[in-house]
């Protein structure tokens, strides 16, 4: 995996990362499953419920379908927070009028990522005009993963990273689930780490003056 870097000079501005086929497949699958959580139509790589128990990495996603109508689900509240946390009636009314459009926007962003990850070749190419929306979608994915990992504070994140480090085999340089007390949590945490790193590299590209200017101009159109 290589983080996002600016495309070569001479062509349209874009952020380009490199992922191997397995990395692309894992990220695309999570993207699709978060889209399903938001009520989107199947992207094409969603969890086969019959196989979930045999897939340690995605066992944490069990119950996403039932969470669609449950605004109290922690993962849903992370990406679709209540507008009035202290007044359930007001919050529910606000959701009724605003949530469908917001869900649709988030699903569209996820679908754009999913399509890019299913292109041939190792490169994940994000045009400058799509960089901010892609970063926002990555935030949604990371929020869902953080919820499933019970990460609420910086201390929780530090504990997770320490757990991952303990599972690392320093001889081969590979993460070995057998070394962890909770292998599924370690694998999910590794995915969270990878997406965080990718998002940070994308934001480094976004924060360039010309990219920010192009994004503002597009929003003004």
Where would I find each of the regions flagged by the language model?
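Charged, alpha-helix-forming regions
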Residues: 1-108, 112-211, 218-221
């Amino acid at each position: 995996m290589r983080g996002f870097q600016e495309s070569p000079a001479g062509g349209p501005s874009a952020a380009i990362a490199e992922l191997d086929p397995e990395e692309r497949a894992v990220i695309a699958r999570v993207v699709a499953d978060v889209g399903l959580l938001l009520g989107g139509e199947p992207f094409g790589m969603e969890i086969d419920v019959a196989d979930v128990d045999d897939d340690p990495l995605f066992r944490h996603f069990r119950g996403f379908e039932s969470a669609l109508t449950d605004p109290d689900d922690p993962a849903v509240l992370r990406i679709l927070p209540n507008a009035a946390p202290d007044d359930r009636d007001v919050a529910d009314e606000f959701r009724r009028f605003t949530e469908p459009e917001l869900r649709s926007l988030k699903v569209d962003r996820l679908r754009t990522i999913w399509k890019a990850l299913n292109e041939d070749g190792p490169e994940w190419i994000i045009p400058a005009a799509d960089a901010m929306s892609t970063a926002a979608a990555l935030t949604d994915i990371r929020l869902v993963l953080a919820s499933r990992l019970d990460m609420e504070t910086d201390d929780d994140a530090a504990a997770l990273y320490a757990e991952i480090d303990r599972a690392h085999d320093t001889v081969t340089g590979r993460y070995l689930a057998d070394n962890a007390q909770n292998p599924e949590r370690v694998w999910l945490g590794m995915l969270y780490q990878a997406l965080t790193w990718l998002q940070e590299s994308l934001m480094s590209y976004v924060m360039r003056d010309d990219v920010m200017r192009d994004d503002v101009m597009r929003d003004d159109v």
